[in-house]
């Protein structure tokens, strides 16, 4: 799964087709050492499984959407995953959440927090667990938004606590750098005494409350990179 490989083949006789928009996003993610969320679909669903992408409707509920992969409008991708098993041939279903590293490194504001809340509402309504591949730079910081982003982060955090206290399950896979709000969400979802879910950290993942750039700009003591913090 790592290293450089190459093959020798006959030169092509036709023009090389340019990459489409989706392929460009996959390549951009790989250049950063990340996996584009839609590439996780086959792995998460498993052999014979299925994934239905979900997005918000006008009323704020998650509903199935039919669109090409990569056309998400927020930094969080939602879906419904079903995987058949020998014990459950009809399939085991769960609600899927994936942070999009190509949208401000998964920074969260109202669009992302609203999807977290809607996903937990859907999972509670259907009695399903949540699988969350977490990758996020924390609350969005920009010139056109302010503390309302933190208000939405707190609202999503409250919903996570209510969801787990009601006996429901969130399983978190830390799939990269998690900064600020996301580690708080991860902890509240999996680390309290009443929670049922697990927290899995991949080798190249990290959970930090403040990122390297923020510490540098504020005059604080940081490290060589976010993993060092």
Regions found by a protein language model. Give the residues of each.
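Intrinsically disordered, low-complexity segments enriched in small/flexible residues
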Residues: 1-94, 98-104
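A structural preference for short, pocket-lining loop segments at secondary-structure junctions
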Residues: 83-100, 114-144
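Flexible beta-alpha connector loops of hexameric P-loop NTPases
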Residues: 102-111, 143-149
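Short charge-dense sequence patches
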Residues: 61-73, 105-108, 197-213
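Structural signal for hydrophobic packing residues in well-ordered secondary-structure cores
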Residues: 23, 30, 45-51, 55-58, ...
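Glycine-rich anion/phosphate-binding loops
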Residues: 72-77, 104-121
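A short linear-motif detector with a strong N-terminal bias
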Residues: 57-61, 72-76, 110-111, 149-152, ...
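Conserved catalytic cores of soluble enzyme domains
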Residues: 134-229
